[in-house]
Amino acid sequence: MLGSGQSRYRMVVAMASVMLAGVFWNGPASARIQGNCGDCHTMHNSQGGSPMTFDTDAAPNNNLLRGTCLGCHAQGGSSATVNLGTDNMPQVMHTGGVDLAGGNFAYITGLKGSGASDRKGHNIGPLTGTDAVLYAPPGGIVQFGHDDGLNVNTNNLSCAGTNGCHGYRYSSRGEGIGGSHHRNVDGQIANPTEPADSYRFLMGVKGYESGDWEETVSSSSHNEYFGLTAPVALGCSNATSCHTSDGAGVAPPDGTMSQFCATCHGNFHTVATDSSDGIGTDTMSPFIRHPTDLALPATGEYAQYTVYDPASPVARTGSVPAAPSGTVSPGSDAVMCLSCHVAHASNYSSMLRWDYSQMVAGGGQTATAGCFACHTTKD
């Protein structure tokens, strides 16, 4: 599995750092890419009789690009960011000691961490190889094409476009995210209308982007995520449909991170529908699946989680923060997908932020991480 995927990946990035030497990423205020157009684009994919693509492939790329997402953001180097003169470019595959907020695909291949495993993250074929066990996304909402892999599966999962996460999800990879780097915004994202002004190019997602992608992170310096105080019933044609009516394609109806994840893993997030049992029939415990987009209770064990922990982030409800806060407010701040998981990959099974096998109730560990960040009295 790792051989073909990694070899293609290494070939793509082998020349990327050389070719990108003149590209600049503007500062956090605008986050728009700057630099010589020819560092990213080629008019005819030909110069001096040779192809201009980063991997010297004779086949040209969409949007006149010299490479794909991997050539810029998955160089496999020793740092979570690559310096490009005036700023840094985030890396989703590297061997550095610090990972960015989205995690690190290197854990899947074994380039970093405790050993290769498909279970450690999303398997992007050209980068990590396809998943050897799963075909359809786990937790797909039970409706046509969503729970059986007909729409998105391990063979077609990509970074962007129809079968990916970033950009418009009705277009191929290139068109789905095309132009977004030139219009990218940073900081508070409260009214997303296109990928460029959506949180991390995730169409329709609201939030606050940390300018360094959490390369340096603390209780007072981090991303902020948007959520709801109570989850909703998701579907294809109701008021909380993931399919937009404004031509934007697939997007979370309320702009929350958990609803975005639910576009593939809907049965893990929705209140029960006619076809999916979801988290249960309502928003009150007991649940049959751990809820998301649900406010932490302001009483009992949950009331003790008051200092923001980047290892167990919460989502803010009501409005999108204009700046990061080091305070957690039980009763309004909500649990979400990323409270427990990372987006790309981690060193633990199921993309978890911690080793689930080490979460031992009543073990007297006085732990404050993992499950016990919220369930403060169960350690």
Please identify what each model-predicted range represents.
Residues 2-15:
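Bacterial N-terminal signal peptides that target proteins for export
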Residues 15-16, 28, 283:
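Residue-level signal for the start and early helices of compact helical domains
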Residues 32-379:
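A motif-centric signal for short, conserved binding hotspots located
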